[in-house]
Design a protein with these regions (language model features):
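Membrane-interfacial terminal anchoring regions of lipid-handling membrane enzymes
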Residues: 1-848
Length: 848
């Protein structure tokens, strides 16, 4: 078997020998020499158990006329089957306290032979075997995927290594070491340990240093951090509590902790990052038209003095790879990324781990051991000043708007910082904008009520199969940083110190966490990139049939672009440099719009089945135009309105819009912005102003009025949602409906509204928007909840609801009034149907 394996290996493997070739140990030739020179034999030392590596070493030792590695090792009267010693075996299980058999049995026997025979010695020759070139020099992405790393390869990967890298394998014999000298040193300096402990540790460290020269340092947390996490005081205490709580042995509780660590930790490797670099470079150049990056200089400056936590918005699964790619290409360390455990799929999960991903469960409330392990691991990342990345929204946005923040990771980051401050922490909000989405059709289905599908390899392949090779550009814009220490000071929490993982967090720290979350989301929106697709979307979706005369469309695009350029939402906001005509050509190229030729002038229309999807890109930039849109809407609807009335209505609506769209302005800054935008619309002739300062709508059927109507439309669906919910609460009466029921019914009515009146907008299906609205109603004291959980309100609420006539037209108000009117019996049936549907979905998810 060995001979056959060796011959087969010789056909595909030609190792390159590095360094000097060792000489055979000198044998004693006279009786005098024999007394002073111990009899030595050679034993080759390999770090990991690998038959193929042993065969390669055997072949080279025979070729170089050295002692063959697979010949029997004979020392005195003792004989071993081969002259190879493996330091690590596949059956070792990485427990905190390895059992005795974790040491190589052959090493134990050889030590016993030397102790019984003082005249004998063994020369241990450490050998390094590497498959493939250095990751920095490899240009084949497939070979990089299987190039040698610090991780011990599986049998399958080793077979692939042999096939791919047989002609580019490397072997190096290192300086021989006396086993007897190692034993004597161990007995002298570590008398309480088995000599095997010292010898295995010393040789492992030695071979690690040799591999590091070629592969670079081992950055994998799976091998380097696991033990420190498990041995930490907090995790050991959690293991003890788990043992008591679960009535299991300490060993079993320890095994659970080890399982959690293996489930969570990153397995970073340079070859995986290089593989991702080559593969993603190909992706961005072939599938997309490249990646445009703005304001990266901010990050480069911060990296010198701060622990960086990247907090991007979450649009697509591609986000995980995109930001790391951008950072890597600009010479900074790739961040460790917190990824949902739904992505811990076979093969895909390992690739993500190799690029720095670590996995977190969606919920682990009530699991004290998992919580302790995860917090300790996060603390280890921050204490090493390793950059970190997570999505503050928790999941991918299905509507294109920012989702309300999930503060779990943020709170644990602050908690770790307060345990022990290494560097000060800075959050880097990052805007990611696409011009087409891989998951677009999936998002539309989910927002229209289809259950969310669990991630799977099959699902990923299914998505890839549907991909068209026209995706436009990807935009990455780094926003204004958020400094944690500044926010802690604002809430008088800068001197708080937390000693243990399970220490309670003072209210001031919780307030600082919430402030940080909102600041991050507001700064993501400040860094918005207004690209050609989002401009086309916000304009064409504002028309009744999603069509415009081409010349009018060009003028409308120019008007929006000029407004965004002359009155930018923020200094970090980026606006496309393309002209209106170029934007239309770009939309045609991406197959999002079509040109309908006509004798009286060509018409630009949204492509079939693209309207709902384009709401996503409209919503990406809605916050940048919502204030001028609201002004235009109020002026157009009322025909004439004083600046004072305009401001009063906007001040009433602003808290709801701010919470929904994470707008940057404080209430104290709002008046200046209203005046600025109103003046801009007057200067552009979209609205008029009389001698008393009243704002007047342009005359109907004029070009200016048509442009005003288009500008006024984007905000209307938010207003319709608000007043639909207000009408529902008013119709049920004070004390007759709970907040939860309002959220559920508003969501249901939104779906019905969309079907009956063709409101093609996914946000009518988004429960988070209704939850946000109810929350702000409570904060603004329009409603309150009684002891039975029912909503109560007074004349203040009724007066605010009556203000709808200043905002919406009569037809829309009647429609909303009609759709929110139903009997107690109808209400009961609707709630029961929703509860049944939710129970079925929960059961389906549980089975999956």
């Amino acid at each position: 078997y060995r001979r056959l394996s060796s011959k087969l290996l010789d056909l595909v493997v030609t190792p390159h020998v590095l360094g000097e070739v060792p000489t055979e140990p000198v044998s004693a030739t006279t009786e005098t020499e024999a007394k002073t020179e111990r009899q030595k034999v050679v034993c080759y030392v390999l770090q990991n158990h690998s038959r193929s590596n042993a065969l390669v070493v055997d072949g080279e030792t025979r070729r170089l006329n050295l002692k063959p590695a697979l010949d029997p090792l004979v020392i005195g009267t003792h004989q071993e089957k081969a002259s190879v010693l493996f330091l690590q075996h596949n059956d070792e299980n990485n427990l905190l306290n390895p059992p005795p058999h974790a040491f190589p049995p052959r090493l134990i026997k050889l030590i016993e032979v030397l102790q019984a025979n003082p005249e004998l010695d063994i020369e241990l020759v450490p050998v390094t075997v590497l498959w493939g070139r250095s990751p920095d020099k490899e240009d084949s992405w497939f070979k990089l995927l299987f190039s040698d790393t610090w991780a011990t390869p599986s049998t399958v990967k080793q077979l692939v290594n042999i096939g791919l890298h047989g002609r580019q394998s490397y072997l190096e014999f290192h300086e021989p070491q006396s086993l007897r000298d190692l034993v004597e040193y161990a007995q002298k300096h570590y008398p309480n340990l088995s000599p095997a402990t010292y010898i295995v540790s010393t040789l492992n460290d030695y071979l690690d240093r040799q591999r590091e020269v070629v592969l670079g340092p081992d950055l994998s947390d799976r091998r380097n951090v696991m033990q420190s996490v498990l041995k930490s005081r907090d995790v050991q205490e959690a293991i003890r509590r788990e043992s008591i709580r679960g009535k299991i042995s300490m060993l079993e509780a320890e095994r659970r902790a080890i399982g959690y660590v293996n489930e969570i930790v990153s397995d970073y490797s340079h070859s995986a990052v290089r593989f991702a670099d080559l593969a993603l470079t190909r992706l961005w150049t072939q599938l997309y038209d490249g990646v445009e990056v703005h304001n990266f200089s901010t990050v480069r400056e911060l990296a010198k003095d701060y622990e960086i936590v990247y907090t991007p918005c979450h649009r697509s699964h591609i986000d995980y790879l995109l930001l790391s790619y951008v950072i890597y290409k600009r010479g900074l360390m790739v961040p460790y990324i917190a990824a949902g455990d739904n992505l811990n799929l076979p093969f895909v999960g390992q690739l993500l781990r190799g690029g720095g991903a670590f996995f977190i469960r969606r919920s682990f409330r009530g699991n004290g051991l998992y919580t302790s392990v995860f917090k300790e691991y996060l603390y280890s990342i921050l204490s090493r000043n390793t950059p970190l990345e997570y999505f503050i929204e928790g999941g991918r946005s299905r509507t294109g708007r920012l989702l309300p923040p999930k503060t779990g990771m943020l709170a644990m980051t602050v908690h770790s910082h307060l345990r022990g401050r290494a560097k000060p922490i800075v959050f880097v909000p990052t805007y990611i904008g696409y011009e087409r989405l891989m998951e677009g059709s999936t998002y539309v289905g989910e927002m229209q009520g289809k259950p969310k599908e669990a991630e799977s390899i099959f699902g990923i392949l299914k998505t890839l199969r549907k991909i068209e090779r026209i995706f436009g550009k990807v935009h990455v814009n780094f926003g204004e940083p958020v400094f944690l220490d500044d926010l802690l000071k604002q809430h008088n929490a800068e001197n708080v110190y937390i000693e243990k993982n399970d220490d309670p967090v003072p209210p001031a720290v919780s307030e600082a966490v919430n402030s940080s979350a909102n600041a991050i989301l507001e700064n993501i929106n400040r860094a918005v990139v207004i690209n050609p697709v989002s401009l086309l979307s916000i304009i064409l979706l504002a028309t009744p049939k999603h069509t415009l005369d081409e010349e009018i469309c060009i003028k409308q695009l120019e008007a929006y672009r000029n407004l965004a350029s002359n009155f930018p939402y923020d200094q970090r906001t980026e606006v496309t440099p393309l002209s209106g005509k170029e934007i239309i050509a770009y939309g045609l190229k991406l197959k999002l719009i079509k040109r309908v030729q006509h004798a009286l002038g060509d018409i630009i229309a949204i492509e079939d089945n693209q309207a709902v999807l384009l709401t996503y890109f409209r919503n990406n930039i809605l916050h940048a135009f919502v204030l001028p849109s609201l002004i235009a809407s109020l002026v157009e609807h009322n025909g004439k309105i004083s600046r004072a009335d305009l401001s009063n209505v906007i001040y009433t609506l602003y808290p709801f819009l701010k919470a929904e769209l994470f707008l940057k302005w404080k209430s104290s800054e709002l008046k200046e912005q209203i005046e600025q935008y109103a003046d801009a619309l007057v200067q552009s002739n979209l609205i008029q102003q009389d001698d008393e300062g009243n704002l007047i709508s342009s005359a109907p059927n004029t070009e200016e009025h048509n442009q005003l109507v288009v500008l006024a439309t984007p905000v209307k669906q938010s207003l319709e949602r608000y007043y639909m919910t207000l009408a529902l609460i008013t119709q049920r009466g004070s004390g007759n409906i709970s907040a939860k029921q309002v959220e559920e019914l508003s969501h249901l009515l939104g779906q019905r509204l969309s079907v009956l009146y063709e409101f093609n907008s996914p946000e009518f299906f988004d429960k988070a928007l209704f939850q946000s609205f109810i929350k702000v109603l409570t904060q603004q004291n329009y409603i309150r909840t009684n002891d039975q959980g029912q909503i109560e309100f007074d004349d203040n609420f009724r007066q605010m609801a009556a203000g709808a006539q200043l905002v919406l037209d009569e037809v829309t108000l009647q429609m909303l009034q009609h759709i929110t009117t139903f009997t107690d019996e109808e209400l009961k049936e609707a709630l029961e149907a929703m509860a049944s549907q939710q129970a079925k979905r929960r059961l389906k998810r549980k089975k999956a």
